[in-house]
Amino acid sequence: MEFQDHFSQEMVLHQQQQQQQQQQNAVLRSMLPESPHHDARKSPPTWLNTSLLRQQHSQFGNASSPSSAAAAAAVAGGNNFLHLQTSNSDSSNSNQWLSPTAAAGGGSNGGGSGHNDELSESMNFAKKMSQQHSGGGEENNNNNNNNNNNNNEEENSWEREKCKADILNHPLYDQLLSAHVSCLRIATPVDQLPRIDAQLAQSQNVVAKYSVLGQGQPPLDDKDLDQFMTHYVLLLSSFKEQLQQHVRVHAMEAVMACWELEQSLQSLTGVAPGEGTGATMSDDDDDQADSDTNFLDGGFDGPDSMGFGPLVPTESERSLMERVRQELKHELKQGYKEKIVDIREEILRKRRAGKLPGDTTSVLKAWWQSHSKWPYPTEEDKARLVQETGLQLKQINNWFINQRKRNWHSNPSTSSSQKSQTQECR
């Protein structure tokens, strides 16, 4: 409404002072060559712009209200008031009564006006208010979500504790604990087994704790809990067998691979695993305290600090290797027991078959002693010995051959007679 009142008043004044304005327009045209250069795309100032400018200065005094500036801009058709002045001082003065938006924009928009600037300011203000309102709502929603999450976490924590209490009070809990401990004991080094026993000694405290939590609370569904406990015990039992298989097979393969690496390093470097750097035992005794102190202080300056030293197994690794060997030995005995027994019997049978009875060998030895100078029985002697001993001719021949080999150098008469016989044949 204020805009319309100013606009009508200015139009009436314009009609009354038309002649005076024509004279002023002529003066302005004469001054245009001396004014600063304007953009060619902008329209030149008109008499209406000049009239409005003069009326704003004369009627509204300081001319600082945004509504008057908006009215002048609307009538001017979007032309910038800065281009209507002839000096920089006039331009700076005109900027004093322009609206903040118009002064900032410089009126350079082709179809912009003061009224549109006021509308845009109102829209920006409303937008900011709506953003602040929506931001506060988001903060409230976040707080509510955080509270809900905290409540859900507390409920879930209580449910977990309640489930643990029901499991501890179940009849199959002892079997479940035993199966779990059995899995732990399989690959645990021997020197660390007391830690498991110490934890088992404290199990009563844990049972008492959860028993207190479970008092006054309804138990879980017996069917679901029974099914869970049964399946979990079976699962741990199956897992125990898998761990045993892993220790017997895969762990032993790892131990053998490590041993092969040690042998390869020994062949390349010539230093056996476990050998020192040439220091004597007395030097080791002197440096023992210093090495212990450095280890406790966190120093890692030793030869094995970065894993580049000799591959010396630790005590836990030795115990694990010994356990693996015992397991494999027991497994081999159980799997190949029958074959081992058969092989042993076969060896003994062959030994018995190759060894002659004592009474028969005494007869052969008697003949050997009586014919020590020439221990070569004739065919008649062999046939008689076959009858006396009951042996085969092949066995008698083999016995005399072996006997001559055993006593070849112990009987000098035999060797000398053999040599003389050989010379006579030549």
Curated annotation (Swiss-Prot):
DNA-binding region per UniProt: 348-411
Gene3D superfamilies for the chain: Homeodomain-like
Summary of the tissues where the protein is detected: Ubiquitously expressed in the mature plant.
Chief location category: nucleus
Xref: Pfam families: ELK (PF03789), Homeobox_KN (PF05920), KNOX1 (PF03790), KNOX2 (PF03791)
Transmembrane segments: none
Keywords from the UniProt entry: DNA-binding, Homeobox, Nucleus
SUPFAM superfamilies registered for this protein in UniProt: Homeodomain-like
Molecular function terms, GO-annotated: DNA binding
Low complexity compositional bias, start-end: 15-24, 139-151, 413-426
GO cellular component: nucleus
GO BP, one annotated term: regulation of DNA-templated transcription
Protein localization: Nucleus
Stretches for region Disordered: 1-26, 85-158, 270-290, 406-426
Family of this protein: Belongs to the TALE/KNOX homeobox family.
Protein task: May have a role to play in formative events in ovule and embryo morphogenesis.
Protein name: Homeobox protein knotted-1-like LET12
Organism: Solanum lycopersicum (Tomato)
